[in-house]
Amino acid sequence: MDPVDPNLESWNHPGSQPRTACNKCHCKKCCYHCQVCFITKGLGISYGRKKRRQRRKPPQGDQAHQVPIPEQPSSQSRGDPTGPKK
């Protein structure tokens, strides 16, 4: 292995940064581009803000899914299920 100049910062060591910039491509070659690309693209781990997904609006005028729920018969009181004690 080549000796590393101790006066250089660790991020300036040879081989510490890839020769090409990272891009948004998710092909196999780009997923293994560097450690950051592997973590974000290959493993799908990102620690940034999560975008809020918008809710899908129901289609207008479609009442097929708006079936009313039939009421359930009321159950007996919540006391002893065997009945009142004498």
Swiss-Prot record:
A motif (Nuclear localization signal, RNA-binding (TAR), and protein transduction) lies at residues 49-57. InterPro entries: IV_Tat, Tat_dom_sf. Residues 49-86 are annotated as: Interaction with the host capping enzyme RNGTT. The modification Asymmetric dimethylarginine is found at residues 52-53. The modification N6-acetyllysine is found at residues 28, 50-51. One of its GO terms (molecular function) is metal ion binding. Asymmetrical arginine methylation by host PRMT6 seems to diminish the transactivation capacity of Tat and affects the interaction with host CCNT1. This is Protein Tat. It comes from Human immunodeficiency virus type 1 group M subtype D (isolate NDK). The gene is tat.
